């Protein structure tokens, strides 16, 4: 089966930094992540207090919301940017169906 991976030591700190950097409440963060239908806003608090580790899907949603690489969030050797690129009303870029 292999060895369990080490848990990132700064994950909770970085998730809180993302939410604060985006200027969002916990409820707004949940909406921004697009996970409001699947989890309660209290889960955001649990992530930020290091009481629970988010799933990969949730971490990907954080990375998209903040417009940063997933590696920046989960790798303790990487720092998040001081200003998050996602602090504008980011809804993604619509892909063209042109060929």
PLM regions and their residue ranges:
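Short, charged recognition helix plus adjacent turn
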Residues: 2-5, 64, 74-99
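Residue-level recognition of specific faces of alpha-helices
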Residues: 14, 43-46, 72
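Short alpha-helical "recognition helix" segments of helix-turn-helix
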Residues: 29-33
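A short, Lys/Arg-rich alpha-helix, primarily the initiator
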Residues: 1-22
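Key DNA-contact positions within bacterial/archaeal DNA-binding proteins
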Residues: 27, 38, 42, 71
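Recognition helix of helix-turn-helix/homeodomain-like DNA-binding domains
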Residues: 34-53
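DNA major-groove recognition helix of helix-turn-helix/homeodomain DNA-binding modules
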Residues: 51, 55-72
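Residue-level signal for the short linker/turn that defines the boundary of a DNA-recognition helix
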Residues: 10-13, 23-24, 39, 54-57
């Amino acid at each position: 089966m292999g060895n369990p991976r080490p848990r990132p030591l700064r994950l909770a700190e970085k998730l809180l930094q993302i939410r604060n950097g985006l200027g969002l409440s916990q409820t707004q963060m949940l909406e921004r992540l697009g996970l409001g239908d699947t989890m309660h806003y209290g889960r955001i608090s649990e992530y930020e207090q290091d009481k629970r580790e988010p799933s990969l899907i949730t971490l990907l949603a954080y990375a998209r919301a903040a417009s940063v690489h997933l590696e920046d969030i989960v790798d303790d050797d990487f720092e998040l940017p001081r200003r998050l690129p996602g602090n504008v009303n980011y809804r993604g870029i619509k892909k063209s169906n042109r060929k």
